[in-house]
């Protein structure tokens, strides 16, 4: 019986996620954003309270929902890629998981955009690729910040 280790689990999850991304880009028309009527009410409510500034971080998601979706989806992909490479027995891959995650994720994004050229009513977009890269980059930064904080906290205990 084969014993699954951390690498095999993350590799499987990463491959399933890549297939999910491929499936999404194979659809001729993606599901539209949900009804945002309640958000307009929330914005007006926060304006009345003088707290409209709380909405500013979400402006990008409101203005460019498709690019925001790319960022979020590829951030998940970047997290999985990093964990897969970090748990690899290959010393180079595990030591340089961040740049390799960016490289592999970006190459996957390029092939995904190329694939969309052949999907009816879809097209390749350099802006989508930029959003994919930003998601991958945010994931790596999140991981670096997490482990940096973890290291500082562990040093503070000693």
Predicted regions and their residues:
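Bulky hydrophobic segments
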Residues: 1-120, 126-127, 133-158
């Amino acid at each position: 019986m084969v014993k699954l280790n951390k690498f095999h689990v993350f590799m499987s999850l990463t491959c399933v996620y890549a297939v999910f991304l491929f499936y999404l880009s194979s659809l001729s028309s993606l599901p539209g954003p949900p009804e945002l009527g309640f958000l307009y009410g929330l914005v007006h409510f926060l304006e009345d309270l003088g707290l409209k500034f709380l909405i500013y971080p979400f402006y990008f998601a409101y203005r460019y929902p498709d690019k925001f979706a790319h960022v979020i989806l590829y951030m998940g992909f970047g997290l999985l890629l990093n964990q897969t490479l970090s748990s690899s027995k290959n010393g180079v891959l595990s030591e340089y998981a961040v740049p390799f995650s960016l490289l592999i994720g970006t190459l996957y994004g390029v092939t995904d955009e190329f694939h969309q050229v052949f999907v009816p009513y879809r097209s390749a977009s350099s802006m989508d690729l930029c959003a994919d890269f930003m998601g991958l980059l945010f994931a790596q930064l999140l991981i670096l910040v997490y482990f940096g904080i973890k290291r500082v906290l562990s040093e503070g205990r000693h």
